[in-house]
């Protein structure tokens, strides 16, 4: 997250760290969001090329805030199955969404909780909050503490003006400030973009891609969750 501030424990109870384990060490590489006790939502490009039926060495951590400290609130569960969207396009990042089936159930509390989905076809508006442990500048360092930043949503028309009409699909939603300086970045991928224009918080986007990070005139591009609600409900079973 570029231009963000530290979150506090329990502020984003739906945020997950999606990690790879290797020789006893765990490495954060993407974000994810809690859908229910047994499923998480992340980006397709975070899992592309993995063994979807029998993934090994993948885990999610819920209730995490500071990666360098054991807060006692963490819940770590391995990923038992990956459900990648059947129309995911790795080159164009169309339909950049996947589900992670967990090998056990999360226990919900003040620090670990699901995030609601919008109605299928809902158009999010206003300001949104994006969170993650990704780099705090383009090509920069990663923070220990979860970062948050608030940015306004950008219309599809404006985003197509910025990137080109052939780059922004209906399955995408854009957010950012015109002058740059606030954005998601490498390592935030798969994580949540939360909106609340309905009066309660819901998952509006999944961190997907962008031209660099926080560059003027190039908003962050996210998977539009309202485009995929029916798919999520049909596959998280």
Curated annotation (Swiss-Prot):
This is Trypsin-1. Its EC number is 3.4.21.4. Pfam families: Trypsin (PF00089). It comes from Astacus astacus (Noble crayfish). GO terms for cellular component: extracellular region. PROSITE patterns: TRYPSIN_DOM (PS50240), TRYPSIN_HIS (PS00134), TRYPSIN_SER (PS00135). Signal peptide: none annotated. The active site is at residues 45, 96, 189.
């Amino acid at each position: 997250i570029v231009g963000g501030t530290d979150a506090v424990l329990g502020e984003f109870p739906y945020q997950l760290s999606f990690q790879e384990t290797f020789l006893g060490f765990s490495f954060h590489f993407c974000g994810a969001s809690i859908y229910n006790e047994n499923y998480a939502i992340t980006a397709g490009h975070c899992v592309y090329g993995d063994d979807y039926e029998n993934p090994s060495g993948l885990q999610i951590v819920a209730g995490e805030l500071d990666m360098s400290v054991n807060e006692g609130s963490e819940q770590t569960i391995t990923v038992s199955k990956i459900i990648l969207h059947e129309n995911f396009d790795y080159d164009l990042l169309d339909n950049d969404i996947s589900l992670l089936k967990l090998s056990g159930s999360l226990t919900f509390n003040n620090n670990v909780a699901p995030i609601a989905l919008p109605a299928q076809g809902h158009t999010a508006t206003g300001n949104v909050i994006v969170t993650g442990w990704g780099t705090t500048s383009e090509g920069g360092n990663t923070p220990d503490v979860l970062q948050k930043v608030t940015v306004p949503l950008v219309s599809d028309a404006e985003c197509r003006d910025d990137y080109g009409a052939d780059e922004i699909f209906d399955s995408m939603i854009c957010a950012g400030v015109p002058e740059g300086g606030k954005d998601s970045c490498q390592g935030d991928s798969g994580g949540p973009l939360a909106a609340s224009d309905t009066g309660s918080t819901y998952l509006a986007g999944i961190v997907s891609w962008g031209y660099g990070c926080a560059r003027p005139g190039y908003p962050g591009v996210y998977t539009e969750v309202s485009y995929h609600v029916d798919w999520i409900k049909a596959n998280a079973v």
